[in-house]
Every structure is written in structure tokens, then in C-alpha cells.
Regions:
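A glycine-rich helix N-cap at a beta->alpha junction
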Residues: 20, 24-34
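Active-site cores that bind ATP or allylic diphosphates and position pyrophosphate for catalysis
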Residues: 33-390
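N-terminal catalytic cores of NTP/NDP-binding nucleotidyl/phosphoryl-transfer enzymes
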Residues: 1-18
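Short, charge-rich amphipathic segments
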Residues: 16-18, 22, 68, 176
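Functionally constrained cores in energy, signaling, and assembly domains
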Residues: 3, 19-21, 60, 345
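Generic alpha-helical scaffold signal
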Residues: 12-16, 24, 39-47
């Protein structure tokens, strides 16, 4: 993800700094998932991710989950792809009881597997966690785009993703963010490799971080008070009365109050957190539908070492979409792609890329110091090159 992540929050530090933390730990190549995918639900996030990896010739994809049973995940993904009539009926039944779509789907899958697949019926409850759901969506996306990529599941150890307790070197991402937010830098450093933590510390000292969901509170409260119901209807996801709920709750005194005002049995907090950004970044139905159908229209490189750079050099002549390493030259890159008759939709490319640029501008407005917020643009950023690992 770039500067805004799938849980519907700003990242703790900006995308190039996070790319640098990965490179110093031995990663060869860091690519950005466009923001039109990074703050979608698990299905949209996985679709954009798999398209991106497939375009650059990745042969194997590894993801963390609470189960390492890839066969169980494949069985569930097959149901989601084929949508058998029995499963579809179960899904409608659970939706009619008022469950949110993620929960209705989870219960429908549980009921379907219990009756149709005795091999996995005793383990279907494992699929309910967010990481397992995302893993299933990766498998679904691999099949839907007909990728030859081989999936591998790596079992998570230590704290669960949302565990807020500090547990030393195996603390969750949630716990680490909470420690940093509370100023407990020393404890946070125990859970992050020193080279990576030094980069995070550099960003904090410069005023370019840490950024938390609370930092967008005043903006969102003001922004949503200015919108009418017609405004909401221009954007993706505002269905089943959500436009009315957002408008009614816009008079809330805090972001937390707003979220719980909008929340219902059908609309989960995670969905609402993501949805909050859609009017800000102008996520229309057409943009999201086309993005999910045709995939990212470019590859955005955030960082590489010599090995990663060589890989890009080796594949550039067989690429179906352009590779953007210097954002300020994106028009030149697109012109070159058109001359090579690459398979791109220029209007969709511009729409996706402009949202990435907007995300950087918005994120920079959350920095602590005015000098850090000033003149911060994706067009001024340079790809990170890790020479030490070359």
C-alpha cells in the first residue's frame, strides 16, 4: 500500500520511507499498490495486488495467515469463484437477517462447506480471520486473471494482527503503532529490526510522522458537513442508505462518534473507515469497476537494489503496461507505452495515477511541521536505490 492502507487509515510513515525499511531488510524490489486498490475491501485489494505481481513476472506469492492449509483456502476460493446455487441461497438468507456482507459471506461459506465438503467441514471456522479472508481473495484473484503464479501460505506466529498488547519481538502491527502513538519508542523498537526502526525514527524526528487515524479527524468532520446526499451518490459504495447515515452523522463531535453513529449490523467499522476516503479521492463507481475488471494500468516502483533493477530491465521489453520509476516523467512513459502498442486504457491510467498523486498531497497535509507539509508532491519524489545491498 501507498500512504493509505486497507484498514482505512493513513500509514504511520510515508510510502518511500516504508519502501526503504523493506530494502534494508533484503527486499529486492518494492512496488506501490495504487490507492484505488489499497483502500478497497479484501477482494479489491487482492485483485490489484495479484494483477501487479503478475505483470512483473512473479512466479510465487507468499502471504501470512492464521492457517497454513492452502488446500482449505483453495476450497473456499473455488466456492467464491463458481458461486454454486446452494451457496448463493445461503448468502441471501444471511444477508436478509441483517448481517454485513463479510459476515453473511462467512456464515454462508461455513454452512456450505459443512454440507458439501466433508474434508474441510471441521476446519471452516479458521477462515473467519481477516488474514485468512485476504489469503482466500488472493487465490480467487489468481484464478480469475488466469495467472500461473503459485500461492504459498505462511502461518503467523505470536500476537494476532489486531492484538493491542505489547509482546516483545512478536508484537502485532496494531500494538507497535499504539506504542509509538503513546511515545513508548523504546518498547516499539524491540519489535522492529534496528535498520528499519532507524528509518522510522528519522521520519518522526523530521516531522513527517508518525501519522495516525486521529490526525484526519478534524478534516473529515468538516468535510462531511459540506456534502449533500446527492454528493454521496456520485461515489462508489454509498448504497442501502449509507448516504443518509453519513449525512445524519456528520454533526458528530469526533471521528469515533461519527464512526459508531454510521455503524450498524450491516455496515462494519472497517467498511465505513475505508468508505470515508472515497469522496475525498473521488472513487466513482466507474473507476472502481474498471480498475477491478482491467487491473492497474501501470507499475509504480518505490525502490530497488541492483538485483531488483536488473529484474525490471530484463522484463521491460515484454511488459504489457508501463513501468513508472520517476513520477514527474509519467506522461513521457505513457507516450512511449502507446508507441509500443501496450495494452493500456489511458483514461483509466490517468485516473488511477491522479488518485495516487492526490493521496500524497493529502497525506503530506497531516505532517507535524509546516515546512514538511510545504511543496510535498509525488512528482518531486525519487525512487529509493539501496546501494549497500548491491
Amino acid at each position: 500500500s501507498g500512504n493509505f492502507v486497507q484498514r482505512g487509515e493513513p500509514a504511520i510513515v510515508e510510502k518511500f520511507a516504508r519502501a526503504e525499511t523493506a530494502l534494508v531488510q533484503g527486499v529486492d524490489l518494492v512496488l506501490e499498490l495504487p490507492v484505488v486498490y489499497s483502500i478497497q475491501d479484501a477482494g479489491g485489494f487482492a485483485t490489484g495486488s495479484i494483477w501487479t505481481l503478475d505483470h512483473v513476472g512473479v512466479t510465487d506469492v507468499v502471504f501470512g495467515s492464521e492457517t497454513d492449509d492452502i488446500d482449505l483456502m483453495k476450497a473456499v476460493s473455488e466456492v467464491l469463484i463458481k458461486e454454486p446455487e446452494h451457496y448463493h441461497d445461503l448468502l441471501k438468507k444471511h444477508l436478509k437477517t441483517g448481517h454485513s456482507f463479510p459476515n453473511a459471506r462467512k456464515y454462508a461459506l461455513r454452512d456450505f462447506i459443512h454440507t458439501e465438503n466433508s474434508t474441510f467441514s471441521h476446519r471452516i471456522e479458521e477462515i473467519g480471520s481477516s488474514n485468512n479472508i485476504l489469503g482466500v481473495e488472493y487465490l480467487r484473484a489468481i484464478q480469475e486473471i488466469k495467472s500461473k503464479m503459485i500461492p504459498h501460505s505462511m502461518r503467523r506466529v505470536g500476537a494476532s494482527y489486531t492484538d493491542e498488547e505489547h509482546r516483545g519481538e512478536f508484537s502485532s502491527a496494531t500494538a507497535i503503532r499504539r506504542l509509538i502513538q503513546n511515545g513508548n519508542i523504546e518498547s516499539a523498537s524491540q519489535a522492529i529490526p534496528k535498520e528499519s526502526f532507524d528509518i522510522i525514527l528519522r521520519e518522526i524526528r523530521s516531522g513527517r510522522g508518525p501519522v495516525f487515524k486521529e490526525d484526519v479527524e478534524s478534516f473529515f468532520i468538516s468535510f462531511y458537513r459540506l456534502l449533500s446526499r446527492d454528493d454521496y451518490n456520485r461515489y462508489y459504495g454509498f448504497v442501502e442508505g449509507l448516504d443518509a447515515r453519513f449525512q445524519e452523522c456528520s454533526l458528530s463531535g469526533s471521528l469515533e462518534e461519527f464512526l459508531h453513529c454510521v455503524k450498524s449490523k450491516r455496515f462494519t467499522l472497517s467498511r465505513i473507515r475505508r468508505l470515508m476516503y472515497y469522496p475525498v479521492f473521488r472513487f466513482t463507481d466507474n473507476l472502481i469497476r474498471k480498475s477491478n475488471e482491467f487491473g492497474p494500468q501501470y507499475i509504480r516502483v518505490l525502490g530497488f537494489n541492483e538485483k531488483g533493477r536488473n529484474h525490471l530491465s530484463n522484463i521491460k521489453h515484454s511488459m504489457k503496461i508501463p513501468i513508472i520509476t520517476t513520477a514527474s516523467l509519467w506522461r513521457k512513459v505513457v507516450d512511449g507505452a502507446l508507441k509500443k502498442e501496450m495494452e493500456i486504457d489511458v483514461d483509466l491510467l490517468e485516473a488511477q495515477l491522479e488518485r495516487d498523486f492526490a493521496a500524497v498531497r493529502f497525506y503530506a497535509s497531516l505532517f507535524r511541521y509546516p515546512e514538511s507539509r510545504s511543496k510535498c508532491s509525488d512528482l518531486l519524489s525519487r525512487v529509493i536505490y539501496d546501494e549497500e545491498d548491491s
